[in-house]
């Protein structure tokens, strides 16, 4: 018996025409990076969430890398600081941490719930952030 986990075709079908039109517009105008669509997205999202600035990035790794870099620029994190992450995290989490000169500390999740029940007992003087 097949039980579908996530039927993206069904979910996206109602948006198909809009997706196709947007894709064609991007291809036609030739701006794949920093084009009008990115500017519109950033402006619309900033207004929607009620903040002054939004930066569109290519993926989650870029987003996490910029977040950690921002914390370092603000003096909230320094080279060598420890960041606790679940051991079963996606590699982008580790790459963003190490790219910024920080040290990942991998914590095994609870095998029954996948929660990080062991976080508290693994926090040390070097721990400055938890990415979960």
Residue ranges of predicted features:
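Phosphate-binding glycine-rich loop
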Residues: 31, 35-82, 96-100, 106
């Amino acid at each position: 018996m097949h039980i579908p986990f996530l039927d993206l075709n069904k979910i996206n079908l109602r948006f198909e025409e809009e997706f196709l039109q947007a894709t064609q517009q991007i291809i036609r105008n030739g701006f794949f990076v920093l084009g009008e669509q990115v500017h519109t997205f950033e402006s619309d999202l900033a207004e929607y969430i009620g903040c002054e600035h939004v930066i569109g990035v290519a993926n989650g790794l870029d987003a996490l890398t910029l977040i950690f870099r921002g914390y370092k620029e603000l003096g909230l994190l320094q080279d060598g600081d420890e960041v606790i992450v679940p051991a079963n995290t996606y590699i982008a989490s580790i790459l963003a941490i190490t790219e910024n000169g920080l040290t990942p500390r991998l914590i095994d999740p609870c095998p029954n719930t996948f929660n990080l029940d062991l976080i508290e007992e693994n926090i040390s003087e070097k721990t400055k952030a938890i990415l979960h």
